[in-house]
Amino acid sequence: MSYNILITGASGYLGVYGNLYALVRTEAQADSVKQYGAKPLTFDTRIAAEVNFIKTLGEVGSRSGRAVHFLHTTGAKVFSSHAGAPTDRPLLDNDPELYNIQKSQRSSHTRIQEAVNANNIVIKEAEKHGVRSYIFSPCIVYGEGEGFGNKISIQTVAIVKAAKALQRVYKVDQGEPSWPVCHIVDNTTLYLQLLRKILAGEDVPHGKNGYYLASSGSIVWEELYTAMAAALAKRNVVGDATVVPALGDEDSQILERIRAALGCPKEFVPVQLGGKCTFTAVHGKEIGWEPEFPPEHILEAADAEVELILKNL
Ligand SMILES: NC(=O)c1ccc[n+]([C@@H]2O[C@H](COP(=O)([O-])OP(=O)(O)OC[C@H]3O[C@@H](n4cnc5c(N)ncnc54)[C@H](OP(=O)(O)O)[C@@H]3O)[C@@H](O)[C@H]2O)c1
């Protein structure tokens, strides 16, 4: 049986491909995706948002009589302290209560609340239109992107950008909060494992039970900072490898400079550079995914990550 797959964000860091259509926004990207055997479709998703995708998929499903699927990419932030998620215990991605937990979450950050709402809307609308939905969650992803587009990630990049601008590595959290991590290859293999299972016609947990965190485990932010600070000091990007707290009101000038370096509102600096997330990956292993890299690998890879980011910034 043949399937059609539409991938959005194909030019991004996490973009993957198969037998597919790829959403692009420029002629150059269209040429690039053709080299991967994909047919480019050019449009802007701000115009055709998730709800429209799902509604249209629902029509495809009822006309063809075949199962249709929608895989939404979210992020671990949506399951963290920043998003009002519980952090006093491991939050398992196969917890049958996760949908209700997400429904009850309240975030003081509008953008994060919108991302929480997006997950809930995808699940609800998909259910309504007979579409099977999956919420795929990357976390701190590291390693070189293998696609034709963006080669570098998000959170490790924010650490380097802030350090470069301030010539020092600052931490913005009290205590020792941790966050799940994942090598880009493992992130991709979970995505592909989900696709493989769906295409094989298997009844993969979906809808309210369809959350998939791509992570081999968590690390403490400060350990990541320390490893990256050593790599940054070695390259004279920062004066020395010490990680300095920037937490209170007396540090507001420092936080203002970090804000400027990251190009985000001041209250979003801790969202970009820290926070606590106890989201824990179980679902992936249940569908046969086995990550290759343990969480500590990000610390060993910090030197290469810094090199990669500095080369691509
Ligand atoms: N990388 C991580 O560590 C990480 C962690 C957690 C969650 N995530 C989430 O995963 C998703 C993908 O991340 P990424 O690292 O691959 O991001 P990225 O490198 O910035 O790529 C974003 C992709 O989305 C496309 N895009 C953005 N706005 C669009 C629009 N309005 N219409 C059509 N296409 C649009 C971009 O196309 P152009 O090339 O044309 O701009 C690009 O292909 C994001 O939602 C991100 O928040 C990523």
Predicted region positions:
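Terminal hydrophobic/aromatic helix or amphipathic segment near a protein terminus
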Residues: V204, L213-T278
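Non-catalytic, hydrophobic alpha-helical segments
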Residues: N187-Y191, A214, L224, G284, ...
